C-alpha cells in the first residue's frame, strides 16, 4: 500500500491532468504493491505491464518506455479526490482555555494524581529496603560499605541471603537485587553495576536515598497492574469528565502517546524537561540508575527504561506526570521512530491530563489569572498544517486546497477516494498526537466535512462539556492572540443539563445575538453602526462596526455594570423558554451560558485620550458644545482612515482583546416552580381509609360483584365430589 501511496503523491505534481474524474480502478499491480518490474521479473524485457481493471475487468497494457510516468498519469486521471474541511461544532469548541501552569489547574492535577497513587504506591524510604546478597558477595564489599549494613540506627541498611528472603514477609518491602537472576519479588529494584558498582560508592545509603526520590514504586499487591493501569485509574476518577462511550478509546489514546514518548527517548536519546523545573529531566535509563523490575506473567521480567535526572519537586503537576510516565511498562519499541516530535507528544499528555483533572476538581472553572483566549483561525491553520505537512500523508496523496461556504474561503485538504479510509484513520491518530498545541487555541475535537457539507468523519477527544467550558468566576479581559481575518467575533457557550438539547442551544445563541444587537445599539451616538450575523461555517457570530473603540468600551461597560448583561440574558432565555416550551421539559434542570467577545480595536488609546480632552474642555468652557459634538461625530468614523493606513503596514495601532463573561447558571426547576408550572411542595390529601383498608375494601367489592354474577366459586375437590354424586344418582 505504501508503494501505491507513492504513486498517488507523485501524481499531484502534474497540473495538466484532470483531478476529479471517477476511477474505474488502478492496475492490480499498483493496488497490491507488487508490479512485475518491482519484483525484478523478466517482464521488464517484455516491455509490457498488465493490470486488471477492478470494476470492469478490462486489461490495461503499457509499453516500457516511461512506464512509471504512464502509470502515474493514469492514477492522476482516474482517482477521484475528496475535499475535507475542518469544522468545529459547538460541543468541541472552547471559547476560553487555561494557561500552562495555571495555579488552579496545577492544584487540581496534583490532587487527582495523588488520589491515583493512593494505596497503589509505596513510601520509598530506606527503612523499607532489604538487599539480597550471598555471604560471599557481602564479604567482598569494602569495610566502609559493610558498616552501613551492620551498624545500629535508623540509617542502617538491611540485607539477607536469598534462602532467607524466600520465606520472609515482604509486604511493603522493596528487595534490591544485584542482578536479574534468581527470584523476582513483587517489588524488586535492580542495583546498577552489581556488587562491583556498590563497592565503588562512598555511601550506599546516600546513593539509595537519592535514587528512591526519583522513582515511583508500586505496592506488592499492585505490582505490574499498577504500572499498566495508573492511566486507567485516572480515567475512573475523572469518568464524569469523559463521554462514557469514548472512555476505552481515549484511555488507549493516552497510553499510546506515552508509549510513543518512551520510544522516542529510548531510541533517539532525547529528553523531556519539566516546564517549571528545567533541572528535572526525564531521560533514558543510565548505567548508574536503579531500575524497577516486575514479573509479567510467570517468567518475563520487565525493567523500567527511563529515569529522572533529579528528584521531582513536590506540588508540581508537570513533575508528577513525568513520574507516572517513568513507571509505565516498557514495550518493545518499533523500528520506526515516531514522526511526532517529543515535545509535542508530552504537551498533548500534559494538556489532556490537566483538562481531565480540571474538570473533576474545578468543574471547568478557574481563577481569572489562569484564563487564556482561544482562536478559531489559529486552531484551523495549525490543524491543516499538521495534516498537509505530514510526509506519510503527502505520499498517500493528501494535499492542501481551499473550499468555499458562500463567499467565504476556508482551508481544506484533498484525500484520494480509494485511500480515504486509511488516510482518515491516520489523520485521527496524527491530530490527537498534536492535541496539546491545538488545545491551547480552543480545540477539543473536530469534524471533517466533505464537499457536500456533510459531517463525514469525527475526531473525538472523549472530553465532555466540563472540559470544554473553561471560565472564571468573574468577568475578565485578556489579550486575543489571533490569525483571524474577522475583526470582531461574538462566541457563545451554552449547555443544558443533564440532557443536551442542541435545538435549545441553537435558540439560545440566536436569541442572545438579537438581544445583544438591541442592547448595544441602545444609547449609541449618531453615526456609529453595529450589526451581528452568524458565521457561515460554525456557531460563532461576527459583528461589524465603524467605530471599534466605541463598541469595545460599550461592551466592556455592559459586562462591568452587570445589570445590562443580566437583562440581555434574561430576555434571551425567556424567549427561548417560551418558544421551546422548556418549562415542561423535565429532562433539562440547568441551563449554563457564557460569552466571549473578541475584538481588534483600532486607535483605542487615541480615542480615549480624545474623549478625556474633550470632556475637560467642555467642562471648563474652552470648547463650545457644538464643536465637541462635531468632534465626537468625527471620532465615530475615525476607524476607516486608520484601517486604510494599517492595511499597508503592520497594525501597530490595533489591540486585540477578548472579553470573557462569567458562566451564568439558571436553575430551571426554580424557574418552573416560581411560574407555577409545578408546586414547590406536594399537597397531602387525607383519606378516610388507610392504604391497607382501601385495598381490603376493593377486594371485598370485587368478590361481591363476581359472586353475584357467577355464583359462589367451587374448589376442584367440590366439583369432583359433585360429579360423582351425580353419576351415582343416574345409576340408581
Swiss-Prot record:
Polar residues composition-biased segments: 13-23, 31-56
Record protein name field: Non-structural protein 4
Ranges annotated as biased composition (Acidic residues): 719-732
The organism of origin for this protein: Wound tumor virus (WTV)
Residues covered by region (Disordered): 13-74, 706-732
Amino acid at each position: 500500500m505504501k508503494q501505491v501511496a507513492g504513486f498517488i503523491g507523485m501524481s499531484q505534481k502534474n497540473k495538466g491532468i484532470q483531478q476529479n474524474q471517477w476511477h474505474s480502478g488502478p492496475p492490480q499491480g499498483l493496488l497490491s504493491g507488487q508490479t512485475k518490474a518491482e519484483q525484478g521479473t523478466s517482464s521488464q524485457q517484455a516491455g509490457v505491464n498488465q493490470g486488471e481493471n477492478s470494476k470492469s475487468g478490462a486489461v490495461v497494457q503499457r509499453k516500457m518506455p516511461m512506464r512509471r510516468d504512464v502509470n502515474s498519469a493514469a492514477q492522476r486521471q482516474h482517482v477521484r479526490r475528496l475535499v475535507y474541511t475542518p469544522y468545529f461544532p459547538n460541543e468541541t469548541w472552547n471559547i476560553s482555555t487555561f494557561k500552562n501552569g495555571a495555579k488552579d489547574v496545577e492544584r487540581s492535577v496534583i490532587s487527582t494524581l495523588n488520589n491515583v497513587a493512593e494505596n497503589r504506591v509505596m513510601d520509598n524510604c530506606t527503612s523499607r529496603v532489604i538487599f539480597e546478597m550471598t555471604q560471599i558477595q557481602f564479604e567482598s564489599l569494602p569495610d566502609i560499605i559493610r558498616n552501613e549494613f551492620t551498624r545500629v540506627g535508623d540509617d542502617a541498611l538491611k540485607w539477607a541471603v536469598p534462602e532467607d528472603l524466600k520465606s520472609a514477609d515482604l509486604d511493603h518491602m522493596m528487595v534490591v537485587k544485584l542482578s536479574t537472576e534468581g527470584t523476582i519479588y513483587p517489588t524488586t529494584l535492580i542495583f546498577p553495576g552489581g556488587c562491583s558498582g556498590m563497592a565503588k560508592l562512598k555511601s550506599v545509603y546516600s546513593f539509595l536515598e537519592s535514587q528512591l526520590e526519583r522513582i515511583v514504586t508500586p505496592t506488592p499487591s499492585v505490582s505490574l497492574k499498577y504500572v499498566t493501569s495508573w492511566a486507567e485509574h485516572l480515567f475512573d476518577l475523572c469518568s464524569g469528565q469523559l463521554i462514557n462511550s469514548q472512555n476505552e478509546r481515549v484511555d488507549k489514546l493516552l497510553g499510546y502517546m506515552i508509549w510513543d514518548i518512551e520510544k522516542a527517548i529510548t531510541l533517539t536519546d532525547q529528553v523531556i524537561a519539566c516546564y517549571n523545573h528545567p533541572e528535572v529531566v526525564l531521560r533514558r535509563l543510565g548505567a548508574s540508575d536503579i531500575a524497577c523490575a516486575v514479573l509479567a506473567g510467570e517468567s518475563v521480567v520487565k525493567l523500567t527504561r527511563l529515569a529522572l535526572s533529579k528528584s521531582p519537586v513536590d506540588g508540581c503537576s508537570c513533575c508528577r506526570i513525568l513520574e507516572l510516565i517513568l513507571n509505565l511498562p516498557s514495550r518493545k519499541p518499533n523500528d520506526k521512530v515516531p514522526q511526532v516530535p517529543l515535545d509535542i507528544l508530552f504537551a498533548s499528555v500534559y494538556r489532556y491530563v490537566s483538562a481531565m483533572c480540571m474538570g473533576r476538581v474545578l468543574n471547568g472553572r478557574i481563577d481569572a489569572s489562569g484564563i487564556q483566549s482561544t482562536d478559531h483561525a489559529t486552531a484551523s491553520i495549525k490543524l491543516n498544517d499538521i495534516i498537509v505537512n505530514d510526509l506519510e500523508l503527502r505520499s498517500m496523496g493528501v494535499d492542501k486546497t481551499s473550499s468555499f461556504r458562500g463567499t467565504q474561503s476556508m482551508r481544506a485538504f484533498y484525500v484520494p477516494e480509494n485511500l480515504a479510509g486509511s488516510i482518515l484513520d491516520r489523520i485521527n491518530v496524527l491530530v490527537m498526537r498534536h492535541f496539546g498545541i491545538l488545545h491551547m487555541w480552543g480545540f477539543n475535537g473536530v469534524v471533517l466535512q466533505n464537499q457536500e457539507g456533510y459531517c463525514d468523519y469525527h475526531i473525538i477527544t472523549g472530553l465532555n462539556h466540563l472540559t470544554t467550558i473553561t471560565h472564571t468566576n468573574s468577568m475578565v479581559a485578556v489579550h486575543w492572540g489571533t490569525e483571524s481575518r474577522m475583526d470582531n467575533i461574538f462566541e457563545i457557550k451554552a449547555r443544558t443539563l443533564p440532557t443536551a438539547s442542541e435545538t435549545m442551544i441553537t435558540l439560545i445563541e440566536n436569541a442572545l445575538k438579537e438581544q445583544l444587537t438591541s442592547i448595544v445599539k441602545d444609547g449609541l451616538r449618531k453615526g456609529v453602526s453595529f450589526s451581528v450575523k452568524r458565521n457561515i461555517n460554525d456557531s460563532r457570530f461576527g459583528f461589524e462596526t465603524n467605530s471599534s473603540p466605541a463598541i469595545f468600551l460599550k461592551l466592556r461597560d455592559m459586562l462591568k455594570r452587570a445589570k445590562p448583561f443580566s437583562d440581555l440574558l434574561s430576555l434571551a432565555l425567556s424567549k427561548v423558554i417560551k418558544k421551546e416550551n422548556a418549562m415542561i421539559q423535565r429532562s433539562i434542570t440547568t441551563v449554563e451560558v457564557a460569552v466571549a467577545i473578541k475584538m481588534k480595536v483600532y486607535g483605542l488609546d487615541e480615542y480615549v485620550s480624545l474623549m478625556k480632552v474633550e470632556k475637560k474642555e467642555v467642562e471648563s468652557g474652552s470648547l463650545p458644545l457644538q464643536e465637541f459634538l462635531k468632534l465626537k461625530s468625527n471620532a465615530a468614523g475615525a476607524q476607516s482612515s486608520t484601517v486604510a493606513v494599517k492595511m499597508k503596514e503592520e497594525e501597530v495601532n490595533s489591540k486585540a482583546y477578548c472579553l470573557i463573561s462569567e458562566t451564568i447558571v439558571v436553575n430551571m426547576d426554580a424557574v418552573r416552580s416560581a411560574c407555577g408550572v409545578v408546586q414547590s411542595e406536594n399537597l397531602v390529601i387525607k383519606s378516610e381509609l388507610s392504604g391497607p383498608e382501601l385495598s381490603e375494601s376493593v377486594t371485598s367489592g370485587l368478590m361481591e360483584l363476581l359472586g353475584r354474577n357467577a355464583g359462589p366459586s367451587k374448589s376442584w375437590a367440590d366439583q369432583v365430589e359433585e360429579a360423582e354424586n351425580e353419576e351415582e344418582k343416574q345409576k340408581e
